[in-house]
From Swiss-Prot:
The keyword Iron-sulfur does not apply. PANTHER family: HOMEOBOX-LEUCINE ZIPPER PROTEIN, HOMEOBOX-LEUCINE ZIPPER PROTEIN HOX6. Probable transcription factor that binds to the DNA sequence 5'-CAAT[AT]ATTG-3'. It comes from Oryza sativa subsp. japonica (Rice). The keyword Transcription regulation applies. Its main location: nucleus. It holds the Pfam family Homeodomain. Residues 15-27 have a biased composition (Gly residues). Belongs to the HD-ZIP homeobox family. Class I subfamily. One of its GO terms (biological process) is positive regulation of DNA-templated transcription. This is Homeobox-leucine zipper protein HOX6.
Amino acid sequence: MDGEEDSEWMMMDVGGKGGKGGGGGGAADRKKRFSEEQIKSLESMFATQTKLEPRQKLQLARELGLQPRQVAIWFQNKRARWKSKQLEREYSALRDDYDALLCSYESLKKEKLALIKQLEKLAEMLQEPRGKYGDNAGDDARSGGVAGMKKEEFVGAGGAATLYSSAEGGGTTTTTTAKLMPHFGSDDVDAGLFLRPSSQHHPPPPHAGAGFTSSEPAADHQSFNFHSSWPSSTEQTCSSTPWWEFESE
């Protein structure tokens, strides 16, 4: 294709400079297109060397049957066309790179906007719990502290376990469990409620002068026995004589 284009626009003057009135030939005689063989030889030489020295031009012109001036003009025009095509190729490559960069820029711009929106949503989510639950946090802490002070167990100065209970009306009562229930163990005291008698502690033996009189029936005395292991009436005395007779004496 390049050879055909070159043959169309490269028409060299093969005749000499004649006078105005000289009838050597017309314009068609003075101009001649390059043949295909000449164009191929010139292009092969141009592929190896874009600019020829005067000696190389003369030798190539002799081989092709052309004038050195024709060879020089052909190489000059060919270099101009070659540079123009090279610039077009470079421009096309740069244009493609620019389009790719522009597309990448637009994609990154959209991604940036999406990330900004996502960041704003996360910031709103972080601020929402503070405004919604921040005021109630203090109330929960205060109510928890009051509930914790409802019922607490302390140890008195004398070593006896005491139960401290705070009433809602503001009054406080402190009672010593050892004074109230001497027959119950410490494991039976659960939040101020005495549910069952202790199986590990037995009541002390009756003191002299503090027993029941003989006028009281025995059935009434036996009704105060709390434990099944409480000794019977026969086991409380060393003989068969009831123990209240000794006390009455």
